[in-house]
Each structure stands twice: as structure tokens, then as C-alpha cells.
Amino acid sequence: MSEKPKYYITTAIAYTSGKPHIGNTYEIVLADAIARYKRSQGYDVFFQTGTDEHGQKIELKAEEAGITPKEFVDNVSTEIKRIWDLMDTSYDKFIRTTDEDHEKQVKKIFKKLYDKGDIYKGHYEGMYCTPCESFFTESQLVDGKCPDCGRPVQPAKEEAYFFKMSKYADRLIEHINTHPEFIQPVARKNEMMNNFLLPGLQDLCVSLSL
């Protein structure tokens, strides 16, 4: 008997600065539909979802609520998981970024990439919007404010670690060109190629404390 082909699917992990919204629900419903469809085709599916529980915005929200950040994310993550279970989504694992096992695996992978030279130390600098948790260049600002939410931004600079995505740009372009079904739908493939890969893929900051 041949081994079942494997299929891995994950959602973005929901941010725990507040209650879940329709966008989170929409995403997991779509992922659940794909997972169920692939199982019906005979695939060995592993479907993962979860919550992102780190960030300055969470710290500020916890302070406003008069509780610790851990207590705050515990409440939000529990509510998100309750809703996913209420909807009978068929995920195989619900990951929390505060889980001991998750932290252990992240450290293991980070060290492996650092030892390999794929992660290096540098500086990240820009105008930072706390509500959006995003950095912007001066040229991206609208009237000196965040282009996404319109709130004031603050200059920020800190030492950080970067992943050498630029090192893999040519390999990614070649793979996408030889496997046109790799990114779907086609509009997203074109967006990735034209907006990120072909102009020159930038290294990714992976350790901001903000």
C-alpha cells in the first residue's frame, strides 16, 4: 500500500491585540474547506492555525486593561480557539507563540540559520506606527502620518537580526517560472514576481522588539 501524499496548510496566525474579527473567520473557513477537500482526495493533511501573542500593541492593551500581557493574550487566544471550535473547523494543531514548544523550536531554527549565515545582525530604522505595528519610509507617509490608519508615527531605530531573503531570489524566480501552479491564483503570482522578486528581494527583519 503506497503512502498517502502529504499536504500542509496553515492560516496566518491571528493577532491577539483584540477580539477576532470577520477577516480571521473568513480565512480559517477557506483553509478548512481546502483541508477537507484535500483529505477527500486521499491526502495526509496537516492543518495548522493559531495565535500571534507578541508585540508592543499587546503590551499597551494589557496595560489599559490593568492585567499582564500574558493574561491578556490568554483571554484573547482562548476566545479565538472557542470560536474556531464552535465552527467545527478541522485544524490538527492550534499553535500559540507563547507555547514552550513553539519557543523552543523557533530558537532551534533561528540558531541553525544564524550558524549557516542566513541570519545576520544589523539596524532597522524608519517611522513606526504603533497601532498598525508597521515601519514606513518618509516617502510612504501621507502628510507625515501613517498611510494605513492616518495616525501619527514616531521615528524608531534599533539593532535587529535580518534573514537573507535576497540570497534566495534567483532560486525562487526559477522555481516559480518552472512551476507556474506554485502560487495561486495567477494574480498573486504576478504580484509576487513584479512587486517583490524582479525589482530585487529585500532582506527581512526577523527580530524587532516593537
Positions of PLM-derived features:
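Structured secondary-structure scaffolds
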Residues: 2-49, 101-105, 158-210
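A short small-residue
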Residues: 12, 56-62, 89
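Short glycine/serine/threonine/alanine-rich loop segments
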Residues: 43-44, 67, 89, 118
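Short, solvent-exposed turn/loop segments enriched in Gly/Ser/Thr/Pro and often Arg
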Residues: 47-57, 97-102, 131
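A charged helix-plus-loop insertion that forms the helical arch/lid used to bind
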Residues: 61-74
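A broadly conserved sequence feature marking short terminus-proximal activation segments
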Residues: 72-128
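Cys/His-rich short segments
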Residues: 116-173
